[in-house]
Swiss-Prot record:
Disruption phenotype: Sensitive to thiabendazole (TBZ). WD repeats lie at residues 10-50, 53-91, 93-132, 231-270. The keyword Phosphoprotein applies. This is Spindle assembly checkpoint protein bub3. Involved in mitotic spindle assembly checkpoint signaling, a process that delays anaphase until chromosomes are bioriented on the spindle, and in the repair of incorrect mitotic kinetochore-spindle microtubule attachments. Localizes bub1 to kinetochores and suppresses activation of bub1 away from the kinetochore. Belongs to the WD repeat BUB3 family. InterPro entries: WD40/YVTN_repeat-like_dom_sf, WD40_repeat_CS, WD40_repeat_dom_sf, WD40_rpt. Part of the BUB1-BUB3 complex, composed of bub1 and bub3. interacts with mad3. Interacts with spc7 (phosphorylated on MELT motifs); to recruit the BUB1-BUB3 complex to kinetochores. GO terms for biological process: cell division; mitotic metaphase chromosome recapture; mitotic sister chromatid biorientation; mitotic spindle assembly checkpoint signaling; negative regulation of mitotic spindle assembly checkpoint signaling; regulation of mitotic cell cycle spindle assembly checkpoint. GO terms for molecular function: ubiquitin binding. Keywords: Cell cycle, Cell division, Centromere, Chromosome, Kinetochore, Mitosis, Nucleus, Phosphoprotein, Repeat, WD repeat. It comes from Schizosaccharomyces pombe (strain 972 / ATCC 24843) (Fission yeast). The lineage of its organism: Eukaryota, Fungi, Dikarya, Ascomycota, Taphrinomycotina. The keyword Membrane does not apply. One of its GO terms (cellular component) is kinetochore.
Length: 320
C-alpha cells in the first residue's frame, strides 16, 4: 500500500486531536473544535464511518476499546462514545477544559488531566472516577507506559508518578524549557520520556536519578525556519514514537513532521504535508500509516491527512 490521502480538507474548525485505533489498523477518530468527533476507515478510498456531535469543543481523545472513545471537552466534561450505537455517557467532569487523556496499564483505567489543576482516574466499567488529585498546577499533557505516568504542567515542572501510588509524584522535574510544555511522550526503549514546548525545542529525559542516567539527558532545537535573517520559532505540538522502530516523530506549527533517531541525536527525514499548524499526529498499530491533523486561527484550517509509510521509512539509519 502506497498512498497519501486527505480525509478532511478546509474544515471551518480545526482538529484538536487524531488517534488511530489500538487494535484495528485502518480506523481512526478525530476530535474537532466544533464539538464533532469523526470516525474514519482508511483504504485506497477512505470512508467516513460516522460523525458525532457533542456539546463542547473536543480537546482530547483515547480509545477504550476498538468501538468506544473516551472524550475530554473544553467545558470539562468526560464522556464515553459508542462508535456503533452513537450513544454517549457522561462519566464526570473537571472544573475546566480536559487537556489530555492517557490510557493506564491498569485494566480499563484512563487518566484525564485538566487546566483546573487536577487529574482524575476513570474506570470505564464503573463509569465514574476511582481516584484523583488536585496538584496545584495546570496540566497541559500526559503520557503513561508500564507503571510510569508523566504530567507536563504549568510553572515549568514535569511530575512523574508510579501509577500504583498516585497520591504523590516520586519525581518533580524542572522543565528544560523557558516556556510552556506542549506535549510529553513515554518511550519503551529507555526509562524516560520526551517533552516539547512552544519555543521550538524538544527534550529527552531519563527517569533514573543516577548521575550516569542523568548525563544522557539532552535538549535540541527543531521546527524553526530562517526568513530574512530572522529565526522563526514554532511550537512543537505533538510527539509520538514509531511503534516498530521507536524513532521519534515531532509535529510543529511550521506544518512539518520531523523524524529523529534520539539514540544518535540525528534527524532522519521530514514530511511537509501542510503549510499551517499541525496540532496532532498518530501512527497506526503496525506503523504503516501516519495520520496528521491541522488546526490554526485562519478560516478553513482544519485538515486530516494520512500517509502510508514504507516499512523502513522511520527506521534508524544503518551504521556504516
Amino acid at each position: 500500500m502506497n498512498f497519501s490521502k486527505t480525509l478532511l480538507k478546509n474544515s471551518k474548525d480545526g482538529i484538536s486531536s487524531v488517534i488511530f485505533s489500538p487494535s484495528v489498523k485502518n480506523e481512526l477518530i478525530a476530535g474537532c473544535w466544533d464539538g464533532s468527533l469523526l470516525h474514519y476507515q482508511i483504504s485506497e478510498n477512505p470512508e467516513l464511518l460516522g460523525k458525532y456531535d457533542l456539546s463542547s469543543p473536543i480537546l482530547s481523545l483515547e480509545y477504550t476499546d476498538e468501538k468506544t472513545a473516551l472524550v475530554g471537552n473544553l467545558d470539562g466534561t468526560v464522556t464515553t462514545l459508542d462508535l456503533n450505537t452513537r450513544n454517549h455517557e457522561f462519566l464526570g467532569n473537571h472544573g475546566k477544559g480536559v487537556s489530555c487523556i492517557s490510557k493506564l496499564r491498569l485494566e480499563n483505567c484512563f487518566i484525564s488531566g485538566s487546566w483546573d489543576k487536577s487529574f482524575r482516574v476513570w474506570d470505564v466499567r464503573v463509569k465514574q472516577p476511582v481516584e484523583g488529585q488536585d496538584i496545584g498546577k495546570k496540566i497541559f499533557a500526559s503520557s503513561s507506559r508500564d507503571n510510569i505516568l508523566v504530567l507536563g504542567c504549568s510553572e515549568r515542572e514535569n511530575l512523574v508518578y508510579d501509577i500504583r501510588n498516585l497520591k504523590l509524584p516520586f519525581q518533580r522535574r524542572p522543565s528544560s524549557f523557558k516556556y510552556m510544555t506542549r506535549s510529553v511522550c513515554c518511550n519503551q526503549n529507555f526509562e524516560g520520556f520526551v517533552s516539547s514546548s512552544i519555543e521550538g525545542r524538544t527534550s529527552v529525559e531519563y527517569i533514573n536519578p543516577s548521575q550516569e542516567a542523568q548525563s544522557k539527558n539532552f535538549t535540541f532545537k527543531c521546527h524553526r525556519q530562517i526568513q530574512k535573517d530572522y529565526d522563526i520559532v514554532y511550537p512543537v505540538n505533538d510527539l509520538k514514537f514509531h511503534p516498530i522502530h521507536q524513532t521519534l516523530a515531532t509535529a510543529g506549527g511550521d506544518g512539518v513532521v520531523a523524524f529523529w533517531d534520539i539514540q544518535v541525536r540525528k534527524r532522519l527525514r521530514v514530511l511537509n504535508p501542510s503549510k499551517i499548524n499541525i496540532s496532532s499526529i498518530s501512527f497506526n498499530v503496525d506503523g504503516s500509516m501516519l495520520a496528521i491533523a491541522t488546526c490554526a486561527q485562519e478560516e478553513a484550517a482544519g485538515n486530516i491527512y494520512v500517509h502510508a509509510l514504507e516499512s523502513n521509512f522511520a527506521a534508524p539509519k544503518l551504521k556504516s
